[in-house]
């Protein structure tokens, strides 16, 4: 979340940023934040004054008794008791103001960087780069859901029987392809210096608030109400929360973690042709990169993550493009985000396979994730993460773009993992 210092010292800049993100009632919300903060400070000033007075009186009581000034000593005792009661009310008011302030801050999104373009939605995103070679397929090329059925790779109907729509069953070589991609992505991350983490796939509410999925995305998360736990929408949540309430040494940075997990998203309101097959699922596999760094290094870290994801797509021989997201299409928590999309030749559309984001200090402030400098100062870290990669649409693109009369061609980079050139 935004810090009080950010809001009080840069109010106009914060408001401009929130307007770029199309955050409703930005002026009213920030005015409330400032009001709650003023009340908290006013009560703190009175409380500090009262505590100083009570402390001074308490010290004087013994001396007054020695001097035989019993009435003055009793008056001092009475005043100390009175101040204690007043201070209880002041502390209660301060606690309530702090709670109200915290609740309000949780509802305010991150402020985008100046380099984020203006815009309302996906149509306003800026194409930064197009790479890879588009595949020329015959007019009767099949979409991936038909290829999956033809080669008995994925059974969507069986998933509906077992669970419901959006929970496919991978079979035979389809399951092997999933495992091949997961191992390939993890191996590539390891080569780039990432330490693999195997985290839980359920988290508590504190973790959801720490990375910003709560309260913003609560309606899109699967909630186990009996135990008050949430199925993770991405490994970002448990991996980043490893560093909640942690003060790191400067020499430990950057931290580079990767994790493969199943991810769960309700995707409420999704329907139509764009959600067919693997295009949008409730459960899917993904490898996630998480980095924690010093503020002055986070731009470089972000670029290194972008280069890593681009390298994966190049090795998979897929046509891709990189988008700089506009303010209106960015996530609640991001300060800067780039999306990677692969082209689906059979569907004639682009499919998002990765978002790589810099959160500045937004998540770190929620998490209380800090580092100690060489000068012994404590500063908030910058957090970054990105998919490397999400499997469903990668599988869709691989099947569609590599279909041949003989079967599905496997990219050279995956052959060591699949053991064959053709499915």
Model segments located where?
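TRNA-recognition modules of translation machinery and tRNA-sensing kinases, especially anticodon-binding
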Residues: 27, 129-422
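N-terminal alpha-helical targeting/anchoring segments
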Residues: 1-135, 153, 157
């Amino acid at each position: 979340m935004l810090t009080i210092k950010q809001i009080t010292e840069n109010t106009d800049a914060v408001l401009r940023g929130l307007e770029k993100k199309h955050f409703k009632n930005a002026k009213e919300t920030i005015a409330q934040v400032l009001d709650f903060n003023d009340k908290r400070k006013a009560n703190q000033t009175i409380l500090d004054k009262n505590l100083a007075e009570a402390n001074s009186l308490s010290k004087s009581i013994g001396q007054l008794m020695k001097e035989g000034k019993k009435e003055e000593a009793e008056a001092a005792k009475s005043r100390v008791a009175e101040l204690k009661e007043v201070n209880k009310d002041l502390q209660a008011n301060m606690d309530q103001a702090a709670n109200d302030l915290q609740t309000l801050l949780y509802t305010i999104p991150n402020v985008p960087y100046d380099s984020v373009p203006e815009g309302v939605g996906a149509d306003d995103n800026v194409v930064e780069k197009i790479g890879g070679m588009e595949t020329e397929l015959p007019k009767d090329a099949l979409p991936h859901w038909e290829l999956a059925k033809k080669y008995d790779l994925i059974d969507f109907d069986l998933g509906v029987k077992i669970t419901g729509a959006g929970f496919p069953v991978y079979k035979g070589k389809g399951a092997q392809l999933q495992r091949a991609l997961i191992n390939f992505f993890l191996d590539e991350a390891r080569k780039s210096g990432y330490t693999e983490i195997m985290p839980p796939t359920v988290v508590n509410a504190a973790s959801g608030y720490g990375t910003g999925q709560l309260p913003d995305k609560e309606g899109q998360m699967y909630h186990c109400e009996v135990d008050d736990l949430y199925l993770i929408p991405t490994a970002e949540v448990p991996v980043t929360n490893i560093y909640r309430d942690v003060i790191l040494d400067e020499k430990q940075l950057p931290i580079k973690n990767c994790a493969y997990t199943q991810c769960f998203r309700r995707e409420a309101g999704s329907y139509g042709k764009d959600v067919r097959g693997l295009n949008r699922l409730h459960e899917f596999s993904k490898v996630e990169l998480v980095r924690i760094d010093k503020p002055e290094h986070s731009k470089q870290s972000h670029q290194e993550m972008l280069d890593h994801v681009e390298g994966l797509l190049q090795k998979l021989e897929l046509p891709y493009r990189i988008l700089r997201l506009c303010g209106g299409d960015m996530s609640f928590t991001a300060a800067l985000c780039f999306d990677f999309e692969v082209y689906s030749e059979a569907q004639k559309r682009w499919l998002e396979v990765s978002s790589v984001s810099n959160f500045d200090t937004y998540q770190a402030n929620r998490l209380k994730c800090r580092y100690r400098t060489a000068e012994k100062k404590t500063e908030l870290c910058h957090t970054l993460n990105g998919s490397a990669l999400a499997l469903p649409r990668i599988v869709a693109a691989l099947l569609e773009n590599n279909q041949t009369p003989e079967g599905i061609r496997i990219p050279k980079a995956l052959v060591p993992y699949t053991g064959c050139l053709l499915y």
